[in-house]
């Protein structure tokens, strides 16, 4: 179109629109990410440097060493993150960390710097920290005590730290192998030359799993040869005559000339320099979970030379590409930052495990094997089967395929599908048989390039193995014979176990049917209806059952808040679990007395503050109203309030543990306007999208259209107030009225879906708090 043929005003308007569109598309999406979101309020995320699904993450470690500067200390309470925004005492940068988890692990191999005379006690060389900055792939901080600027960036398997000594003079680089978040101890390190060290540290005992241990190997290269260097080791405390033999007993002993390897629980390596003012010393670190040699290979391959700026640019570019899969328009600045930070958190775990040569530690045995596809680790499946994997299947289906292939490899290597796998070890944390749900959900979405015969074999093992030999379903015999799991011990989580088995068996029924296994499908479908055993007419809730078949008495439905011990339920109470029958919501409603009683009882969960936004069992509750069209306005109101109240552009902006992306995935789906309240069903509950327009770039290997556009269009232009309701949406030329659920094919093949938004829902006008 030629602008000369347009009226002047129209031409100028078009120019402005074109300019705005260009400006928005050219803006870096990494600048919309705030890595400090979730670093307080027990969100347990961290602001360190990492690339999408990278093995390496490097983050500030500030949870030990100073009662004065730290509000929280990892050794004084339950603590599961190497960093919190509430603390201000910096001990160093830890290499390989977990994001959003509830148990401590990894967060070790801590590199730092100091100025002045050498002191290897981290409570002494640690420093107050200030001027923190972070965005995807980069973090920096000022070490106030030493006048050092510390910066970090990362590749998939390596990191590089830059320490700039502003004053110059006596300067030190310190590698602490004793301090860390892990509950395991013991490390070994040796010099390869004056500027390169290699070694390993023992990790594990995650979430009460004492046998789930593994080694993290490392290779560290310093940019400048040190005039003086050596080891340190904390000596045991001695008494009496014995103490006279060692002047360093009970203290850190310095080894300035010894160059063979050294081992111990509290050891480290130091490098001392005389620096010029403003001089920068770089520390390049490679890691592996196979060997020291592979850690060094990863380092020399991914950082063949020293170029901090190039590594940073590559990290930023990788994030920009990953984030640009979803492009949003409109919304507030805070809403955009919340959304893209959630997408950033989604892409941290699971992370790759294989080294550059394809080697990785096999499941259970930790023997070395080689993979042809990306091998993933950190499968927090009780959390992530609900929304993380469905979202990955939509946005990053090739990643999701490799994750399923990894799960099947784990079955071949260890004999079982994973439940909560961590660096090649099964921790058996939480309950259920979640791999079944992930695999079926992936297949139902059309991602089918994996061995379905092997998958079905693996699924059946957990669903049919009797007795104590069943590692995934330890109470299988009761479940199979009774249709439920009785409460045999005071706090044995029996109801939680059974509810997870029901949704797993429903998914297995769906997969069996797709594989042509009709009898199996019928068996598992019958099992999935066993939730009805727990329904108590007296309270209208699910209630634990004793071995004699009677309900637990006395019964306190609200017991279990704030993780207090609770008979029958894990990390929650009866209210948090009683609507968790995602595969049969209409059946549950009938059991509860019909639509009206179901809706009233579900609404009371929110009215009486029995909804827990910080944990998974009731995370889909807001979307259950969409099964009843006249009540769907409640979903729109509640999700709007929850997003506004619990998801904020600040460190406390996640309602609790991010659970390796599960809370972030809830926010992403909710802001997009649809949610998979029953994984495996290919059905979504709808809510009002947050943004004016969202463009999702789909992978055409798996999806018909290259994009899915979601837009909102107000029906009442006269007001600027937030419109949180809709009762119509349009796909193509078809207008849907009073429809609040949509299936996956309809949505993914829509090309464009338009929500017509308004101020008023199914009740008199309600404003958001």
Each PLM stretch: what is its role?
Residues 677, 702-709:
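Flexible, glycine/threonine-enriched loop-and-boundary segments that flank and lead into catalytic domains
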Residues 728-730:
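Beta-strand signatures of extracellular beta-sandwich domains
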Residues 1-25:
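Bacterial Sec-dependent N-terminal signal peptides
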Residues 24-389, 393-437, 443-499, 507-533, ...:
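Accessory carbohydrate-recognition regions in carbohydrate-active enzymes
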Residues 504:
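ATP-dependent phospho-/nucleotidyl transfer catalytic cores
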